[in-house]
Regions:
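"Short basic amphipathic alpha-helical interaction patches in structured regions
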Residues: 14-15, 51-53, 87-93, 110-117
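Beta-barrel outer-membrane channel/assembly domains of diderm bacteria
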Residues: 1-83, 125-129
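Signature for the C-terminal beta-barrel architecture of outer-membrane proteins
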Residues: 77-80, 93-95, 101-253
Length: 254
């Protein structure tokens, strides 16, 4: 991504061009198993490599290099692996991933993070009786690089190393809509041991007359019991999202 801009902030004027590079790297073992890595070598902590070349306050070029690996994980299908080892067809699928992996649930409102852990999914279930066309259930756990503002020390500092997370979420196509329910347990370790709490999530999304898409989301944090201080993860969020449906719903959403 590259952007050209002139910023006039009253006391400061800068014209600049800035860029960001996303690198997705794959090594495929089979059609269903691969190693994946993701890097952003030209930006770090919200600062982009850029050149300031006009304006009263231009300072030249600044390279913001970043050698950190943002994601590195293995993913595959246990059913396909078992089939290959035994040289026999199996009728079940169990996709999984392990490593530093990005996960997104509830449109990023509940979870949007890359942490070190594992996840697996029981896919493609259905029920004619309940009018359910598809159900996917995903179990996940994270043991490092878990970011949450709900786990803080007495001095207010946060951590990504002393927090574990365990959860399950289900995606259900039913009643001509899309349901998403989930549960998570955030487990603080060592100095953050009293910061544990539970998460409950629910969402329903549906299109109406092919004109508007509506989502209703509910997310709750409960059960935290900090010693001698106020809770940092105690409350709920009710969010209503609306968007118009266009002729290109995958690329243009007003």
């Amino acid at each position: 991504r590259t952007a050209l801009a002139f910023n006039d902030n009253g006391t400061k004027e800068i014209g600049q061009i800035a860029t960001r590079l996303n690198l997705d790297l794959d090594y495929r073992f089979t059609a269903t198993e691969r190693l994946h890595a993701f890097m952003r070598p030209l930006d770090r902590n919200g600062n982009f490599s850029r050149c300031e070349f006009f304006g009263n306050d231009e300072t030249g070029c600044d390279s913001v290099l970043n050698a950190n690996i943002e994601a590195f994980f293995f993913e595959g299908d246990l059913g396909a692996i078992v089939s290959g080892i035994n040289d026999n067809y199996v009728s079940w699928d169990l996709p999984f991933s392990i490593g530093l992996m990005p996960l997104l649930f509830q449109n990023g409102v509940w979870v949007e993070d890359a942490f070190t852990g594992l996840a697996f999914t029981i896919p493609a279930m259905n029920s004619k009786t309940l009018d359910i066309t598809n159900v996917d259930i995903t179990f996940f756990a994270g043991f490092d690089d878990v970011s949450t503002s709900g786990v803080v020390a007495v001095d207010g500092s946060s951590t990504e190393d002393d927090v574990n997370i365990y959860g399950v979420t289900a995606f259900v196509d039913a009643m001509q809509g899309y349901w998403e329910v989930g549960y998570g347990y955030t487990d603080g370790q060592d100095a953050f041991d009293d910061s544990d709490y539970h998460n409950f999530t629910f969402a329903f999304t549906k299109r109406y007359r092919n004109k508007i898409s509506n989502s209703i989301r509910f997310i709750s944090n409960v059960g935290q019991n900090l010693v001698g201080r106020s809770e940092t993860a105690d409350g709920y969020l009710l969010l209503i999202e609306n968007s118009l449906i266009t002729s290109k719903p995958s690329t243009f959403i007003p």
